[in-house]
UniProtKB/Swiss-Prot annotation:
A Pfam family this chain is assigned to: Tti2
A single Gene Ontology CC term: nucleus
Function: Component of the tel2-tti1-tti2 (TTT) complex that stabilizes protein levels of the phosphatidylinositol 3-kinase-related protein kinase (PIKK) family proteins. The TTT complex is involved in the cellular resistance to DNA damage stresses, like ionizing radiation (IR), ultraviolet (UV) and mitomycin C (MMC). Component of the ASTRA complex involved in chromatin remodeling.
Gene that encodes it: tti2
Name recorded for this polypeptide: Tel2-interacting protein 2
UniProt lineage: Eukaryota, Fungi, Dikarya, Ascomycota, Taphrinomycotina
Organism name: Schizosaccharomyces pombe (strain 972 / ATCC 24843)
One Gene Ontology term of the molecular function aspect: protein-macromolecule adaptor activity
Compartments in which it is found: Nucleus
Protein family per UniProt: Belongs to the TTI2 family.
Annotated PANTHER family: TELO2-INTERACTING PROTEIN 2 (PTHR32226:SF2)
InterPro entries: Tti2
Gene Ontology biological process: 'de novo' cotranslational protein folding; chromatin organization
Coiled coil: 4-45
Subunit structure of this chain's protein: Component of the TTT complex composed of tel2, tti1 and tti2. Interacts with tel2 and ttiI1. Component of the ASTRA complex composed of at least rvb1, rvb2, tra1, tel2, tti1 and tti2.
Amino acid sequence: MQYYKELARRLHTLQSKNEKEALEKQIDFLDKLVVEVDSLVHEQDLRPLLEFISPTESWFLLGTATIFYIKLLTHPDPESIDVVIKEAYVVRAHRILSIFQEQFIENVVKEINWEILAILISLSGIENGLVRNLSEFLSTSILSAVPRQKFLLYLLEKYQINLFHREERLTDQGRPVAFELPPDKFHSDQSKALLEPKWKTKNYLISHLIFWIIDQQSSSSIEVCWHRIIPSVLRILNDLSPNIKLQGIELVNRLLKITEREFLLYTGILKILKDDLLVFYTFIPPRFTIQTSVTLINASFATLVSLYPEENENLNSIMLNGINSVFQFAFDYPLILQAAFSQIMVLTDKMNVSYLPYLTLTLDELCRIIQNPQIIQIPSTLSFFLEILTKLLEIYSYRISAHHVELLMALVVCSRNYMRCNLQEHHNAIVQALQNLFTLIKLNITVEQLGDYNVILPLLEPLQIPL
């Protein structure tokens, strides 16, 4: 017994140190412990180790196979931990926890250890299937034996608040200590607080717990606990980590599904959410990778449209304060532009004639894009933008005559630059798209404007584009 007590003491000491160092020192111990536990299971005599899984004792097995295990799995920067060591630890800790799962459930229920239950539910969102399945089994078993409403009350009134609570020390004069620091130190601390908020070190997977809380609510009960849930959702939505932001958007979508629209308008939360989501259009390279930016912008757009599905004022905001930011700051990123124009097609479908005030801006941007050498050298991307231009001109064909000069000039430049590149991929489709656009313009301009069309014909003859 003394041997196990000494190990328990050492493991508790290691938990306060660097994760990687602690893991390396625990691997050998866990190997020996797994072998010993397996032998005890085989002999059907777990009594020598039972006292060490009790939360009232040394938290020995809980400390090794659960608490530290959970800290590792919910670590905000998993890349900082060696993957091989991490997997080795997880497998061994999982084995121990699996063997003692009945005693674990019994002790958590007996001690009403809500925090452990909260973290187990959070782990349902982890990628590791082994861990996720065990966590779901344990949390389901514990929930069936404890008062669910009391647990929900604990999560709403204590756990969330403590997790997101900001500890701010004050000077004798009542001013925050941070403001008394030298400027360099102040900015350093503030930056670290924004990038690495303390809640991430406590439960990096908190959003999955909030998913669970929301799923337990009805349209009436969500209104009662609204003031407890929405601050946490907004904290997650406004986090600087892209992955956390995406979870925040999903949380907003869950709330929108069960909350009455009148209640959202009454509380003013719709406008707050709209403003927060529009900021996503500024998350472009080099701050984020191109793919991350596209993912954030697309997710934000889908939620923004659902906020005010029938109101043009909201759709106007998406165009002016959202997509317009992409035009201004992401012109050199074709994938982001593709996402923006895909969204524009959705807006034109919803707004119809109400989109006309933005048609000139949209056509000007498209003309710039199809003349961009960077775009022309990517046939699939060029084909996409030519298709978008064709669809827009078909929808608003009665406005072609007002823009025919800019359109013809852009198409001539695009055609000449494309033919010079001598690209074979999508060649027939691109030539056909250019031909269709010239024809579409010709059919929708006045007799007087046909003179402008005829002027460009000699420029196209060497390009072998049939008109």
